[in-house]
């Protein structure tokens, strides 16, 4: 047996590697919610961190570990690969170790919340993930609801790849490969939704085929917006900035832009695109690591706070000063006021977003101003304490019948 792990993580030596993973009975085991898997998957806890262990073949484990490291190094939304345990318990067998993604939620939990809008949000997030992978030359090969985890993102969702067993990385991928990947995704989504309906976890009417087919339309619309070629007159160079801003509004940065001139005609095409425009800007300004829509919301609140400061002080306020004061006077006090026993319910940035939404709703009902302190107190007492603890979603009650590897 050999254990290879990244620095900064446990050595995992106290686990019973001489026993098949399915037969483990160990105090480090914890029951965590996750998607349906063809493999045995168990979860172990070391201090404040949880790790997923997946039993597979040695070649598959090494390949998936390498792919996940490659994708993560390129800042794509995937789970963190931690290590591979070789020849455990028998030669040729292996266990892939990944870090559990805090505040991540499986599809069956989200769709079982009886909120029909969530299905659309999950599809939108899945499309963004698939487009990001294809832009980076990644053929997934098994896009499904079970192979994705979602995190809340300021009213939207963000999707993370959690299974790269069939994934291939190329310099670029052809339209044919993209189409095939979409076909697989549509088929798998249909199957996943029908399974949920059959299990009774979805109690509302849902157009399974319509939702799955909309995935293709959403994908094609986003792919076209990000990659299409535009032609316009030489005097309309302002349209270059317009195109870039439209891509930024979708949450993507244009790192390189191909511009060709033929007489009085300009042809432009984005050639290097990276998702996370607002998240990068917020990180540069504040040091906060949040998701894209959360960053968009926080940046808007910083701008509003800066405008309020300028009206209050009667003079211009530098952006850096406004940002520092926002962190100290707005974001810090609100997120820091959450009692310790509630901090595992939502990520700080998501909770902050919900407080802003709650303040708006309170002001509408009151038809007058509501302070942050008032909104926060009402939110903590009436909303947050009723939220499930989503940092590490434990298994309570029924789960999908065909889920493999859960610690019952």
Task: Pin down the residues of each PLM region.
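Short, glycine/acidic-enriched loop or turn micro-motifs at the edges of active sites
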Residues: 102, 145, 166
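A short, basic N-terminal segment
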Residues: 1-17
């Amino acid at each position: 047996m050999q254990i290879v792990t990244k620095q900064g993580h446990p050595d995992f030596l106290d686990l019973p590697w001489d026993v098949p993973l399915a037969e483990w009975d160990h105090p480090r085991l914890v029951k965590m919610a996750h998607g349906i898997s063809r493999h045995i998957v168990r979860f172990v806890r070391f201090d404040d961190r949880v790790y997923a262990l997946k039993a597979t073949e040695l070649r598959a484990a090494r390949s998936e570990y390498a792919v996940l490291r490659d994708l993560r190094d390129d800042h794509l939304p995937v789970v963190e690969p931690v290590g591979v345990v070789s020849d455990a318990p028998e030669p040729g067998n292996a266990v892939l170790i990944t870090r559990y993604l805090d505040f991540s939620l499986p599809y069956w939990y989200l769709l079982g919340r009886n909120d029909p809008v969530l299905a659309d949000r999950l599809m939108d997030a899945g499309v963004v993930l698939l487009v990001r992978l294809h832009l980076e030359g990644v053929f997934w090969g098994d896009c499904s609801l079970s192979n994705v985890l979602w995190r809340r993102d300021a009213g939207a969702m963000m999707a993370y790849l959690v299974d790269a067993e069939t994934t291939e990385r190329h310099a670029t991928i052809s339209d044919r490969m993209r189409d095939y990947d979409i076909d697989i995704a549509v088929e798998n989504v249909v199957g996943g939704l029908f399974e949920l309906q059959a299990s009774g976890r979805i109690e509302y009417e849902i157009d399974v085929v319509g939702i799955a087919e909309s995935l293709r339309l959403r994908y094609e619309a986003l792919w076209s917006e990000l990659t299409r070629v535009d032609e316009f007159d030489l005097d309309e160079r302002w349209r270059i900035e317009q195109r870039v801003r439209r891509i930024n509004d979708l949450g993507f940065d244009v790192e390189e832009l191909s511009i060709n001139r033929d007489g009085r005609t300009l042809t432009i095409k984005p050639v290097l695109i990276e998702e996370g425009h607002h998240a990068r800007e917020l990180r540069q300004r504040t040091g906060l690591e949040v998701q894209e829509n959360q960053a968009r919301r926080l940046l808007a609140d910083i701008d509003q706070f800066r405008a309020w400061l300028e009206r209050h002080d009667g003079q211009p306020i530098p952006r850096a000063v406004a940002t520092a004061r926002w962190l100290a006077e707005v974001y810090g006090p609100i997120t820091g006021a959450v009692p310790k026993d509630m901090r595992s319910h939502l990520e700080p940035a998501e909770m902050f977003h919900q407080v802003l939404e709650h303040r708006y709703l309170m002001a509408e009902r009151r038809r007058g101003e509501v302070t942050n302190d008032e909104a926060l107190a009402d939110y903590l007492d009436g909303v947050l304490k009723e939220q499930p603890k989503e940092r590490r979603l434990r298994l309570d009650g029924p789960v999908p019948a065909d889920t493999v590897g859960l610690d019952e």
